[in-house]
UniProtKB/Swiss-Prot annotation:
Keywords: 2Fe-2S, FAD, Flavoprotein, Iron, Iron-sulfur, Metal-binding, Molybdenum, NAD, Oxidoreductase. The active site is at residue 1289. The gene is XDH2. It is an enzyme of class 1 (oxidoreductase). The keyword Mitochondrion does not apply. GO terms for biological process: xanthine metabolic process. It catalyses: xanthine + NAD(+) + H2O = urate + NADH + H(+); hypoxanthine + NAD(+) + H2O = xanthine + NADH + H(+). Substrate binds at residues 823, 901, 935, 1031. The keyword Lipoprotein does not apply. Key enzyme involved in purine catabolism. Catalyzes the oxidation of hypoxanthine to xanthine and the oxidation of xanthine to urate. Regulates the level of ureides and plays a role during plant growth and development and senescence. This is Xanthine dehydrogenase 2. It comes from Arabidopsis thaliana. Homodimer. Plants silencing simultaneously XDH1 and XDH2 show reduced growth, impaired silique development, increased seed sterility, precocious senescence of mature leaves and overaccumulation of xanthine.
Length: 1353
């Protein structure tokens, strides 16, 4: 088969025709779009896991003669896979100059975009849903379509609110053919279902349709704003375009084939038996990118009609192997409505399983055959095919077809019964029979878009004999427990012929244990959990079948009603929330809920990030050469293979560094490039530059480094035992006399224990990156970096290049999220890129891939706390003795300051007369850990709340009673001797307790628990007191530069960085109020070291306080200069005043400066004012857990904070919601798994969870069903600008309310089996930890009641 020489390979992008040249078979759609300058589509992960690359693809379905619109991940889609299609990116939806689409305006005005990096992806997912909907989508459909999109900033609530309005619109406002035809009475474009005159033409005429490529749309107005009234139509040329075979080439000898008939495909398969067949590239793309596998021949089977065929008959359903999973889901939903209920039991099981399979973007392109033939041992669908009596139709290159039962198809790990000359043609699924039941099972870390830990498909066919039911046939299949989808053959044999009763259940549960054998140390870990799930799933299946057959035959032995909640499906509840705040307007803008200044740029994709910056001529691309072992001597570095790699320019090592190779934010204890010894996996050995990003990465992988391995320390415990601590990091705080208190008899009870908590990945959606270039012959170095600390970049680059700081400039426009992760570690990226840029005198761009970013840039510190607490029988706390350790990794970075804040916050909000705290920073052979929202404070408070819970358990009281009894009050003296002033803790706690209906909800939870054996609810309230300011005194300073122009507009530059937290917006509000002008007259452009020097990092939640005050200082200087002119004339506008001042030669520029007063702490005495003030807060949470699987959801969360007079209440509420959901990830979802003693199946020192496929941050489905936020009213804060308070970090810890609610629910479960004593629960409380803590007859065969799953700390 050869390419039709007369047929160009084309596509349309945003209505513009594009010819696709040969040679791009290696390229993804995302790379192509960004090369076109369409940078609104972002690269967030490169594996289809975050949704930031989402675009809409439209294609013409010749079978149905309709145009179909669907969202896809551009980062996985091969460029040639969209040949003959229309791709619409965010730029094609709407933009500021021509007008925003209603989706974009709604998202912006609803405060649904913070950092903005994920925003275009959300817009495109929703846009594709609207374009593909014949009727207005339901709220469930909206949330389902967003399941493949991640946001780290907002907590999702405002995004859902923004899009919810489209679920309420009239059906006629959507693009369905019938509704628009009825509405307009006009001709309908067959491609779009929208009015178009080409619809009245003949087919040949339509090809030359002269209608504009846009068509009018009619959506509900939102806020009366003006929107674009244009929608891109499907290009008429593509309607007539005949499908033709394609043969196109690519880099490294790749050839792309697209057959358009089964015969074409079989010919290709005969010629290239080892070729990779693909449809959506969702598996092959990952293999090529992450596993570095090479496939020289790729055959796209997507356009083969025979592989997309559907046939529904009296025997069942036959579907082609190339059918997309989203189409399969629609088909099953259709037949369930149309066929008798008893026939569709398997279809219903597939519907439920597909609903939680990946995200919408993946389901839209992934096909049935790919999922089957990949033969993944954790495939969600293969166990169901096997259990449902499905048959696979296989065709060889001669056209011979054979059938094989699905249950016999899988032979071993990634091995199937199919020869290299065969392909999967179709799948046949028979209808189920009366009394035949099929059920799906899956447990993952997260419900949405996650791979299974264990899954299953189960079927039983029953026959009635008298008053009893006997098993005629059965299939029990598990995934995630063996190298292949595993049939429990002995269990199946046991079941067949037996009476369906509880005795059979018990017998089957015993046999399953011998059918499913997982060895200790097996890949994937979680052995006890996985084994217990096999029993839990079967028990659920037995319950479910019994419930159904009882409706048919009421005489069948059944189970108590309290058991039946175990088989209820997890619904997609509509997420709702309330926001309660007062608006204290000050001047023209301060206090108002203004929209984020960049929101409308972000929703249109026009906002630029580091990777979007247009490249200077001759730019080189860099990749890092990284250590592959945790501790070793470097014997040699051989770059000979790299030199022969395509596009190679140079490799730069420590010997090439012009200045000093030793760097570090506080202590210069790190090498930029390792010289003799590496101390972690991922340590940078050198930087390689090439002509393209891909060529740089390819060449870097070819650099051969030889090592002599050395012993490694891979946990806090190992560090403690080896006394491996960073030098001079022991810290001590003391108040009262702990020993005397313990020995005096004052304490009725003394408890001792240990708290461990894992780390957390920042998972900012924008990876770290820098673009560095020289100017003036190399005399100056400039850079654009994704950083919270431009001054740090300036300092590092100056240091390693041997240049004065005055010749180095760092600029930052905005960040796609930071959360502390871009405070210090990002500076290493800029410094590494600066070396080749300086030496070669060429621009160098270094953007980290997601897996590299997660591996090398550090995380939230894991902690271990060892406590001893004395208290009275009433619950009054008397003494705390605490040893606290954090995992610093292989360098100091900010770990000491992190430890100090943890120690400061180890009282949380409690009055403790006698305190002794000793802290140490552990040296381990992991990449250096770093700042993360809360900066040690949450870890210190979590240790405290754990022993508070234990006191309550010891005294048989509810934890909230112990908390209230020990609250600090106005004037309390902390253990570091700072007096609490304006303490609003009691007030907000009392108000929250009432507004959340705490007592009523607790009673309702107890009632629910008494009636439900396998589902349990728990409630908890948690307070917080978070200190505001840097604990390093000199960092509490800020500068700003303000210019007033003669037209009355104002340009503000300050030292803070906008990373989604709304800093620029708040600062602009301060300036607008100061000058009594509208916010629209104030502009904040960027942060730059040549405008505001020596700026502190944007961190510690202090930026609004500091930079707002600095801007106000500058404004007041200008106002004072303007006053003589203003007092003499009555100016109508500020522009008139500014112009008059200009003519009077008055300086309209000012540099503002602010220092935070009253800060002084001495570690020698352990006394002083560590903080300027405190932000107080409290949260209530109600959760529900499935005790059989560990699955949980947060039913409700109520949060209240004291933020004084908020500068911008909606921005602050966005910070609260985002922090809470991020905190929910820390306490319950996100687990870093390292190669350590706890995970010996992982390569030592390596991070397994280095991408969204394995590391799960909260998705939309993980946010609380109801998320209510209120701000305490009437409490101005005299210690910050305009009586406000800091907000970024304080709410984070409040997610611990969900953690302790989970623990309460587990407590209720344990009480069912007589376990009433206190028990430990480590964070994160993943499904594994929840389930294994809920000890019962299904976990007992594998673990004791005190079993604690392994944790990397």
């Amino acid at each position: 088969m050869e390419q039709n020489e007369f047929m160009e390979a084309i596509m349309y992008v945003n209505g513009v025709r594009r010819v696709l040249p040969d040679g791009l078979a290696h390229m993804t759609l995302l790379e192509y779009l960004r090369d076109l300058g369409l940078t609104g589509t972002k690269l967030g992960c490169g594996e289809g896991g975050c949704g930031s690359c989402t675009v809409m693809v439209s294609s013409y379905d010749r079978e149905s003669k309709t145009c179909v619109h669907y969202a896809v991940n551009a980062c996985l889609a091969p460029l040639y896979s969209v040949e003959g299609m229309h791709v619409i990116s965010i730029e094609g939806v709407g933009h500021r100059k021509l007008g925003l689409h209603p989706l974009q305006e709604s998202l912006a005005s609803s405060h649904g975009s913070q950092c903005g990096f994920c925003t275009p992806g959300f817009v495109m997912s929703m846009y594709a849903l609207l374009r593909s909907s014949k009727n207005s989508p339901s709220e469930e459909e909206i949330e389902e379509c967003l399941a493949g999109n991640l946001c780290r900033c907002t907590g999702y609530r405002p995004i859902i609110d923004a899009f919810r309005v489209f679920a309420k619109s009239d059906d006629a406002l959507y693009s369905g053919l019938s509704s628009l035809s009825l509405q307009d009475g006009s001709n309908i474009c067959p491609s779009t279902g929208k009015p178009c005159s080409c619809g009245s033409k003949t087919t040949s005429e339509a090809a030359t349709c002269n209608e504009d490529r846009f068509q009018s749309i009619s959506y509900s107005d939102i806020d009366g704003a003006k929107y674009t009234d244009k929608e891109l139509i499907f290009p008429p040329e593509l309607l007539l375009r005949k499908l033709a075979p394609l043969k196109l080439g690519g880099n490294e000898g790749i050839t792309w084939y697209r057959p358009v008939s089964l015969q074409n495909l079989l010919e290709l398969k005969a010629n290239f038996p080892d070729a990779k067949l693909l449809v959506g590239n969702t598996e092959v793309g990952i293999e090529m990118r992450l596993k570095r596998l090479q496939y020289p021949v790729l055959i796209s089977a997507a356009q083969v009609p025979e592989l997309n065929a559907l046939n529904v008959n009296d025997n069942g359903i036959e579907v082609g192997s190339a059918l997309r999973l989203s189409e399969l889901l629609r088909l099953f939903r259709k037949v369930v409505k149309e066929r008798p209920a008893h026939e569709t039991s398997a279809c219903k099981a597939f519907i439920e399983q597909l609903k939680w399979f990946a995200g919408t973007q993946i389901r839209n392109v992934a096909c049935i055959g790919g999922n089957i033939c990949t033969a993944s041992p954790i495939s969600d669908l293969n166990p169901l095919w096997m259990a449902s009596r499905a048959e696979f139709r296989i065709i060889n290159c001669n056209g011979d077809v054979r059938s094989i039962p699905a249950k016999d198809f899988f032979l071993g790990y990634r091995k199937v019964d199919m020869g290299s000359n065969e392909i999967l043609l179709s799948v046949f699924l028979p209808w189920t029979r009366p009394l035949e039941y099929v059920k799906e099972f899956k447990q993952a870390h997260r419900r949405d878009d996650d791979i299974a830990i264990v899954n299953g498909g189960m079927r039983v066919f029953l026959e009635e004999k008298g008053q009893q039911l006997f098993v005629s046939d059965a299939s029990i299949v598990y995934g995630g427990v063996a190298p292949l989808s595993l049939r429990a053959r002995n269990t199946e044999e046991l079941l067949i012929g037996k009476n369906w009763n509880k005795c059979l259940l018990q017998d089957a549960l015993k046999v399953i244990q011998s059918d499913v054998l997982i060895k200790e140390g097996a890949p994937g870990g979680m052995v006890e959990f996985r084994k217990s799930l096999t029993l839990s799933f079967f028990f659920k299946f037995f319950l479910w079948v019994t419930h159904h057959v009882n409706n048919v035959n009421p005489t069948i032995e059944t189970f108590p009603p309290s058991h039946m909640s175990a088989v209820q499906l997890v619904p997609r509840f509509s997420r709702i929330g309330k926001q309660d705040y007062e608006t204290v307007k000050q001047g023209t803008s301060v206090g108002l809920p203004e929209v984020h200044l960049s929101a409308r740029m972000q929703v249109t994709g026009e906002a630029e990030y580091t990777d979007d910056t247009p490249l200077p001529p001759c730019t080189l691309h860099a990749a890092l050469v990284l250590s592959k072992v945790p501790h070793a001597r470097i014997l040699s570095v051989d770059d000979s293979a790299a030199k022969s790699s395509s596009g190679f320019v140079g490799l730069f090592l420590a010997k090439d560094v012009p200045g000093n190779n030793m760097i570090g934010p506080i202590v210069a204890d790190e090498e930029l490039f390792a010289t003799d010894v590496v101390t972690c996996v991922g340590q940078v050995i050198g930087v390689l530059v090439a002509d393209t990003h891909e060529n740089a990465k390819t060449a870097a992988r070819k650099v051969d480094v030889r090592y002599q391995e050395l012993p490694a320390i891979l946990s806090i415990k190992e560090a403690i035992n080896a006394k491996s601590f960073h030098p001079n990091t022991e810290r001590r705080l003391r108040k009262g006399d702990v020993e005397l208190c313990f020995q005096s008899g004052q304490c009725d009870r003394i408890i001792e224990g240990e708290v461990q908590m894992g780390g957390q990945e920042h998972f900012y959606l924008e990876p770290n990156g820098s673009l560095v270039w020289t100017i003036d012959g190399g005399n100056e170095v400039h850079m654009i970096s994704s950083t919270q600390a431009p001054q740090q970049h300036q300092k590092y680059v100056s240091h390693v290049l041997g240049l004065p700081m005055s010749k180095v400039v760092c600029k930052t426009k905005r960040l796609g999220g930071g959360f502390g992760g871009k405070e210090t570690r990002s500076a290493f990226i800029a410094a590494a890129a600066s070396v080749p840029s300086y030496l070669l005198n060429r621009p160098v761009k270094l953007i980290l891939d997601r897996d590299v970013d997660m591996m090398i840039t550090g995380h939230r510190h894991s902690f271990v706390g060892k406590y001893k607490v004395g208290f009275t029988n009433e619950g009054k706390i008397l003494a705390l003795d605490l040893e606290i350790y954090n995992n610093g990794g292989n360098s100091m970075d900010l770990s000491l300051s992190n430890l100090e804040r943890a120690m400061f916050h180890s009282d949380n909000v409690y009055e403790i007369p006698h305190v002794r705290i000793v802290g140490n920073v552990c040296f381990t052979n992991f990449p250096s850990n770093t700042a993360f929202r809360g900066f040690g404070g949450p870890q210190g408070m979590l240790i405290t709340e754990n022993w508070i819970q234990r006191i309550a358990a010891e005294l048989d009281k509810i934890p909230e009673e112990i908390k209230e009894m020990n609250f600090q009050v106005e004037g309390s003296i902390t253990h570091y001797f700072q007096s609490l002033q304006h303490c609003t803790l009691h007030q907000l706690w009392k108000e929250l307790k009432v507004s959340s209906n705490f007592l009523k909800t607790r009673r309702e939870a107890d009632e629910f628990n008494s009636h439900n054996r396998w589902k349990k609810r728990g409630v908890a309230m948690v307070p917080t007191k978070f200190g505001i300011s840097f604990t390093t005194k000199f960092m509490n300073q800020a500068g700003a530069l303000v210019h007033v122009y003669t037209d009355g507009t104002v340009l503000v530059t300050h030292g803070g960085v906008e990373m989604g937290q709304g800093l620029h917006t708040k600062v602009a509000q301060v300036a607008a109020t100061a000058f009594n002008i509208l916010l629209s007259s104030v502009f904040v452009s960027e942060t730059s070291t040549d405008k505001v020097p020596n700026a502190s990092p944007t961190a510690a939640s202090a930026s609004s306080d500091m930079y707002g005050a600095a801007v106000l200082d500058a404004c007041e200087q200008i106002i004072a200069r303007m006053e003589p002119v203003a007092s003499k004339h009555n100016f109508n506008t500020f522009s008139e005043l500014a112009s008059a001042c200009y003519f009077q030669r008055i300086d309209l520029s000012a540099h503002g400066f602010h220092i935070v007063p009253e800060l002084e702490f001495d570690w020698v005495s352990g006394k002083g004012n560590a903080y300027r003030y405190y932000t107080y807060g409290a949260a209530f949470a109600e959760v529900e857990i499935d005790t059989l699987t560990g699955d949980f959801h947060t039913r409700k969360a109520d949060i209240m904070l004291d933020l004084g007079y908020s500068l911008n209440p909606t921005i602050d509420i966005g910070q609260i919601e985002g922090a809470f959901v991020q905190g929910l990830g820390w306490v319950a979802l996100e687990e870093l798994k390292w190669g350590d003693a706890a995970h010996k199946w992982i390569k030592p020192g390596s991070l397994l969870t280095c991408g969204p496929g394995s590391y799960k941050i909260p998705s939309i489905n993980d946010m609380p069903f109801q998320l209510n936020v209120s701000l305490l009213k009437g409490n101005p804060n005299a210690k910050a600008i305009h009586s406000s308070k800091a907000v970024g970090e304080p709410p984070f810890f409040l997610a611990a309310s969900a953690f302790f609610a989970i623990k309460e629910a587990i407590k209720a479960a344990r009480s069912e089996v007589g376990l009433t004593n206190w028990f430990p629960l480590e964070t994160p409380a993943t499904p594994e930890r929840i389930r294994m803590a809920c000890f019962d007859e299904f976990s007992a065969p594998f673990a004791n009641s005190d079993f604690c799953p392994k944790l990397s700390v």
